[in-house]
Amino acid sequence: MPHLLIIDALNLIRRLHAVQAQQALTPAQALIATRANLINTCRKLLTGSEPTHVIAVFDGEIHSWRKEVYPAYKEGRTPMPVELREGLNTLQDAFWECGVDALLSQTDEADDLIATLASGIAQHGARATIISTDKGFCQLICPQIQIRDYFNKRWLDAAFVEQQYGVVPAQLVDFWALTGISGSNIKGVPGIGPKTATQLLQQYGSLSALLAACQQEEASKPLLKLRQYQDDALLAQRLVRLQRDIPLGFNLREIRYPPAPESEA
């Protein structure tokens, strides 16, 4: 059965680089050390995951559709260090050195590309493993899709979602629609925090059911808040939901692992 390993490239690289940058190295030395650690990490992932296909997905220099509909999207995030951004080509080469192809789009966010890749292979009954610390991918969890937090050595699975949020993976988008995601500067419903969001979704099941309930005369205080800020909740829902239908322009044969000899490609 095919097993696709998807590496959230910048999520991995930025954390590896941050460790080196704390070692009082020069920027050039930190980049060299990051490259060496990236190769070592990549080889560990390939050995441990035993994939039949693999790809590393990068964010490009894009002005995403989310920024178009919500200009404050991701405002306030710490920018990538200049020396790291300027050295991304050599880090991309490090993936290729390990036999891992890289995907970089100038029109789509890496998160949406990863969601499309994982969902596409899952629809055909095959498996996908996403390497990332980004909990946003937990909305994709199903028997065919798993998420591995390499740095904390844990699986971000349904049990993790239940423990962390008190909901099932299919409810996460609606959970974040209510609470917002501070790391992406996405606002939810003022006055509805994680505990209340969990209680509401455990009782009503979904945001659509909550929106129907909040129109009732006997609506509770949290539901009245939702009624007042329902447009914000719907916008947040749209922003946090990953796209799963982006045209990719390549097929699985092109990202086989180990790579096919050029004569067979």
UniProtKB/Swiss-Prot annotation:
Residues binding K(+), per UniProt: 178, 189, 192
Molecular function in Gene Ontology: 5'-3' exonuclease activity; 5'-flap endonuclease activity; DNA binding; magnesium ion binding; potassium ion binding
Region (Interaction with DNA): 191-196
Record's cofactor remark: Binds 2 Mg(2+) per subunit. Only one magnesium ion has a direct interaction with the protein, the other interactions are indirect. Binds 1 K(+) per subunit. The potassium ion strongly increases the affinity for DNA.
Record's keyword terms, sorted: DNA-binding, Endonuclease, Hydrolase, Magnesium, Metal-binding, Nuclease, Potassium
SUPFAM superfamilies to which the protein is assigned, alphabetical: 5' to 3' exonuclease, C-terminal subdomain, PIN domain-like
Keyword check for DNA-binding: yes
InterPro entries in alphabetical order: 5-3_exonucl_a-hlix_arch_N (IPR020046), 5-3_exonuclease (IPR002421), 5-3_exonuclease_C_sf (IPR036279), DNA_polI_H3TH (IPR020045), FEN (IPR038969), HhH2 (IPR008918), PIN-like_dom_sf (IPR029060), Xni (IPR022895)
Gene Ontology annotations of biological process type: DNA replication, Okazaki fragment processing
5'-3' exonuclease domain sequence ranges: 167-260
Pfam families to which the protein is assigned, alphabetical: 5_3_exonuc (PF01367), 5_3_exonuc_N (PF02739)
Enzyme Commission number(s) of this protein: 3.1.-.-
Record-listed Mg(2+) binding positions: 111
First-tier enzyme category under EC: hydrolase
Source organism superkingdom: Bacteria
Membrane-spanning parts: none
Cofactor(s) needed by this chain: Mg(2+); K(+)
Its job: Has flap endonuclease activity. During DNA replication, flap endonucleases cleave the 5'-overhanging flap structure that is generated by displacement synthesis when DNA polymerase encounters the 5'-end of a downstream Okazaki fragment.
PANTHER family per UniProt: 5'-3' EXONUCLEASE FAMILY PROTEIN (PTHR42646:SF2), FLAP ENDONUCLEASE XNI (PTHR42646)
Family recorded in the similarity comment: Belongs to the Xni family.
Protein name as it appears in the record: Flap endonuclease Xni
Protein species of origin: Aeromonas salmonicida (strain A449)
Gene behind the chain: xni
